[in-house]
Structure formats: structure tokens, C-alpha cells
């Protein structure tokens, strides 16, 4: 039997607040997502450096070119298939363009294959999940081939970033809700209905009712867009019946995009809420040769600090691929303030923290006619809700934010004290995403949603 070594960055610890409740059923069937290295990595890095520097002579890659030149090599995929066969695992899907292989097998088979112990945990908010501690182990011939092994542990990785606005209180400062069309007018959204384009939306739970969507778009006087549900890793459109839960996020995402660009096709990718499911969903959208989304919207995320190094690297690599293809990825920056709900200290939200993502924050505004009269950062939510943002602890400052670094240095000198740059890769740009109305489960709601966006990079 080949000697196995820990996969760098794969170490897991016990989730804070979790309780071990026993071993996993060794006969339980699970799926595991394996991500492989990229061919011609140095050449790809050189291309990305030109893109990040804003070189006007660089054109986005086509999906065909990306797959041929920068996908996983046939030899690397063959090595993973041989490893799977040696351990009785089944190859469900091998995607050279996405550099991924999806494996299926029993808990016992995966424990033996990767030398891990899978156990059941109970968490007071996340519920029951399959977890592991320590590192994933791979043999010598896969050590430089495999970048990540995800799905052995299926703890919930993200939460939806939206909040239902509480009822109006006349004693407080005047508040008003806006329809997406009103917001588009206030922010001078460009003309056009998105015809010929596709917007991908990533969802990690819940679902939508087509009747709710039809009613909502009819109330706005706009045609209902074409909405497609795409199943990823056996997840699907499954409404929970609770508009205050993930259904509210799913419905709101579709309604905002559909109202502003009704001519665009909307592909909603439903995936399990785990690091494997999240990454695979975005990867499937990026490499979707049928729907070909040119914009991907993500309203889910979690503190950067709870991701393993391998999952951060794998996810960021997918987002980098999107940038190479000219696909704009927008993600909510969070709604739990500077802590991102992670307890003590400052934390930023991922995937908004990636340098290849357009991070979207929220504001509160007042308007008169077609003009914004007052706008401030959203910072007054119930139970401590506030817009997220900050400085990434995982990604260094990209070239296109050097101007921010200089502004911060000048500000520090003018105050004769040090100052931290308020923008990093964690918030490459903060976009307003203000209160707007939506309809879910036959009920109208006004939501403070920090992730309403659609548009070209």
C-alpha cells in the first residue's frame, strides 16, 4: 500500500459549539469533490497578471480554450480514477475544464482511502452534520496533483445574507421601501433588458414558487423572465414554506434580477450548504456550456476564518477562472458588521473576500423623485445587523487597489497617526443594495438585502 501524506491546508477542527454524538454509519453513501491542479499554471498566472493590471489588449478566454489549455490534464484525471478504483470508489463525474472529479462510496471506503475518521456532531444552530478533525491524507502520486478534497465533512459553511425589515415605526426616522425599478432609476442603471444574457444565482437552501414570481413581476408590470432550476450534487428547488428563511433569499434574488433585466435567462444553481456544495455550485455555473452565465450572483457566505486553507484556495481558483472568462461574480459582503458574526475580533465574509469578486455592501437611503437625497451605510439592523466589510486575512492587496493604499497612507500622515486601509480584497468595491420589496409564499415582505446586483464588470 502506498505511503500517504497530509494534504496541505486540509486540517479541520471541531466546530465551536458542536457536540460529538457518535460514529457515522460505515455503510452510508456519500459523495466527495476532488479538485486538481491546473495545466500550464505559470502561463495562466501570467495571463491573470495582465488581466488584473487592466491590460486593454487581453481578451477573455472562451470556455473551449480554457478547457483545452488550462484544465486538468488527462494524466492527472487518470491518476485519480486509478486511486478511486483501488479503494472501491465510483467516479460519478470527471470534468477536465473544471479540474474536478466527483467520487461516490461508503463512509468506510472514504475513511480508508483518505485515512480520516468521520463522526456525527450536533450543533445548536447548524443541526446534525458529518465532521472530521485533522488532515486528509493522499498518496505520493497525488500529493502534487490534488488541490482539495471536499465533502468528507459536510458541516454548513454559509448563511444567506438578507434580513426582513421590521414594521415601520413612525417615531423613528422616515423609512421607505423601493421597488427594483425605482432603485434602477435612482442608480442610473443602464438601458437594456439583458436579452441574450444569462445571470447565474447560487443558492444553498430553500427554493421558489413560480406562482409567486409570476404575481410579483405582474405587479411591477414587467414580463416574467425565463427561470431555470439547476440541480448540483443532488440538491434542488425545494421551498421550505418559510419566507423568513432561505426561501426569502432565493425569491428575492430572482425577483431583483428579473425585474431589472427581464430579458435575461436566470439559472438558479441549487447546492448543498457545505464547502464542497458551495464550491461545486459556483464551478458548475462558471463552466456551464448550456446556460453560459455572464454574471453570477451569490447572496451566501461565511466568515473567512471558518474556511480551511484548501477550500479557500479551491474556491478562489474557481473565481479566478471566472475572471479569466470575463464572468462577473458578485457576492454579499455580509450583514453582521465587522465581526461577521464570528465572535471576538474583526472578520470579513467569504467569498466576498476574494480579489476576483465584486463585493456588495448595503446602504440606507432617502429619495425625492429620481434623485437620492441622503444615503448612509446600513448600520441599524435588528439584533445588531450591519453591513459587512474590512480587510482580508487571507488575500493580499491586489494591484487594482493600490490607489486605496495610497489614499490611506495620505490620510494617516495628515492625522499624524497610523490608519488601516478600509478596503482590501475583502471589499474590492462596496455597492449599495438597499431595502426592496419581494413576494414569497403569497406574502409581501420588505427586505434589507445587501446583495442586490446585476451588471457587467
Model-derived features with residue positions:
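Surface-exposed, charged/polar loop-rich segments
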Residues: 361, 374-376
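Substrate-binding/charge-relay-adjacent region of secreted/lumenal peptidase catalytic domains
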Residues: 2-94, 102, 107-362, 386-452, ...
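Extended ligand-binding clefts on enzyme/binding-domain cores
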Residues: 381
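Short acidic, Gly/Pro-enriched loop/turn segments at secondary-structure junctions
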Residues: 366-373
Amino acid at each position: 500500500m502506498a505511503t500517504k501524506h497530509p494534504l496541505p491546508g486540509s486540517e479541520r477542527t471541531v466546530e465551536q459549539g458542536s457536540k460529538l454524538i457518535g460514529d457515522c454509519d460505515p455503510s452510508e453513501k456519500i459523495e466527495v469533490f476532488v479538485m486538481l491542479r491546473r495545466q500550464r499554471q505559470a502561463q495562466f498566472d501570467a495571463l491573470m497578471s495582465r488581466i488584473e493590471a487592466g491590460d486593454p489588449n487581453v481578451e477573455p478566454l472562451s470556455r473551449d480554450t480554457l478547457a483545452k489549455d488550462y484544465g486538468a490534464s488527462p494524466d492527472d484525471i487518470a491518476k485519480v480514477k486509478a486511486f478511486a478504483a483501488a479503494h472501491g470508489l465510483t467516479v460519478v463525474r470527471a470534468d477536465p475544464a473544471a479540474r474536478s472529479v466527483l467520487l461516490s462510496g461508503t463512509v468506510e471506503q472514504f475513511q480508508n482511502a483518505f485515512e480520516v475518521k468521520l463522526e456525527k456532531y450536533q450543533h445548536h444552530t447548524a443541526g446534525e452534520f458529518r465532521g472530521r478533525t485533522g488532515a486528509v491524507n493522499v498518496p505520493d502520486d497525488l500529493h502534487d496533483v490534488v488541490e482539495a478534497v471536499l465533502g468528507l465533512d459536510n458541516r454548513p459553511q454559509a448563511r444567506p445574507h438578507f434580513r426582513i425589515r421590521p414594521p415601520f415605526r413612525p417615531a423613528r426616522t422616515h423609512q421607505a421601501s423601493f421597488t427594483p425599478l425605482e432603485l434602477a432609476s435612482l442608480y442610473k442603471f443602464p438601458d437594456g433588458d439583458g436579452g441574450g444574457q444569462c445571470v447565474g444565482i447560487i443558492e444553498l437552501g430553500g427554493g421558489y414558487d413560480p406562482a409567486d414570481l409570476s404575481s410579483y413581476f405582474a405587479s411591477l408590470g414587467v414580463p416574467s423572465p425565463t427561470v431555470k432550476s439547476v440541480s448540483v450534487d443532488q440538491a434542488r428547488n425545494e421551498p421550505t414554506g418559510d419566507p423568513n428563511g432561505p426561501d426569502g433569499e432565493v425569491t428575492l434574488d430572482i425577483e431583483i434580477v428579473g425585474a431589472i433585466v427581464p430579458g435575461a435567462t436566470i439559472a438558479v444553481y441549487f447546492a448543498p450548504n457545505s464547502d464542497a456544495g458551495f464550491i461545486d455550485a459556483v464551478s458548475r455555473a462558471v463552466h456551464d456550456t448550456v446556460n453560459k452565465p455572464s454574471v453570477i450572483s451569490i447572496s451566501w457566505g461565511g466568515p473567512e476564518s471558518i474556511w480551511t486553507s484548501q477550500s479557500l484556495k479551491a474556491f478562489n481558483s474557481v473565481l479566478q477562472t471566472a475572471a479569466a472568462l470575463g464572468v462577473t461574480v458578485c457576492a454579499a459582503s455580509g450583514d453582521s458588521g465587522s465581526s461577521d458574526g464570528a465572535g471576538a475580533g474583526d472578520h470579513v465574509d467569504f467569498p466576498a473576500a476574494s480579489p476576483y469578486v465584486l463585493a456588495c455592501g448595503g446602504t440606507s437611503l432617502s429619495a425625492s423623485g429620481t434623485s437620492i437625497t441622503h444615503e448612509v451605510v446600513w448600520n441599524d439592523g435588528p439584533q445588531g445587523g450591519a453591513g459587512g466589510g474590512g480587510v482580508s486575512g487571507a488575500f493580499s492587496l491586489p494591484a487594482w487597489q493600490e490607489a486605496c493604499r495610497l489614499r490611506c497612507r495620505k490620510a494617516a500622515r495628515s492625522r499624524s497617526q497610523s490608519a488601516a486601509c478600509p478596503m482590501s480584497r475583502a471589499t474590492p468595491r462596496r455597492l449599495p443594495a438597499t431595502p426592496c420589496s419581494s413576494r414569497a409564499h403569497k406574502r409581501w415582505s420588505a427586505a434589507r438585502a445587501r446583495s442586490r446586483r446585476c451588471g457587467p464588470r
